[in-house]
Amino acid sequence: MLNGIIENLIVAVISYSASTLFHNRLRLKIWFQSLLRWNKNIRLSCAYLFKINYNNKYLLIKGKRIDQFQPVGGVYKYYDSFNELKDKMELVDESEMHFHENGDLRLKTKGRHLVRFIDWFDSKQNREVTVIRELIEEMELSEIPVDRLIRKTQIEYLKTIKEPIKFSTHFQMDELKIFNIYKAEIPNDILDEVLKSSHYQLVEANEIERQCLSQNGLDRKISETSKYII
């Protein structure tokens, strides 16, 4: 009987350990990567993107700073209450020449603070948690009344993407990008008005996969991040 209890206990411990490792495998990977980059700079970017469907196609918007079509969305903002913790984690705002606006969660830090930063981001404290701001800003060009857009749109969370840390040739440093993906259900009558503007484009899933759109006889680039809304 005692042997049976011990065996069951061992099995339970092994099962629990295996389950814990499985569910925290990404976290363990990031922890290991942070050790390898302990004193190296890492760029951090935390954003949210919207999956907006219309007749089995996906709505993209023309980039403001890069000549491409990309998902509606943008970067989260942090609040003043984050400043003390920001200093402790040696977080530095990105230069304005790299698309940074005041309060953007586009920062850089040392690898040793990486896990702590992700813990903070996942806690949703000291930062923007609503996602309506970027939807309103991105839809401004369509001249849809804001109150109508807010009242008629249903938004639901789909998933979170934490990209593997990789070297950015543009920023000349390693970077970690985090994307929260949301589905925005916008009535067709509103989308009909939105599509009157050349700033918006409907694309097929295969065009997103190819990162290329044919428009007026020309090939137009589709952002790599668009794949996350398929």
UniProtKB/Swiss-Prot annotation:
One of its GO terms (biological process) is defense response to virus. It comes from the Bacteria. Keywords: Antiviral defense, Nucleotide-binding. One of its GO terms (molecular function) is nucleotide binding. Effector protein of a CBASS antivirus system. CBASS (cyclic oligonucleotide-based antiphage signaling system) provides immunity against bacteriophages. The CD-NTase protein synthesizes cyclic nucleotides in response to infection; these serve as specific second messenger signals. The signals activate a diverse range of effectors, leading to bacterial cell death and thus abortive phage infection. Causes cell death in response to 3',3'-cGAMP upon coexpression in E.coli with V.cholerae DncV; inactivating DncV prevents cell death. Belongs to the CBASS Cap16 membrane effector family. Cell toxicity relies on the N-terminal domain; its replacement by a SUMO domain prevents cell death in cells also expressing DncV from V.cholerae. This is CD-NTase-associated protein 16. It comes from Streptococcus mutans serotype c (strain NN2025).
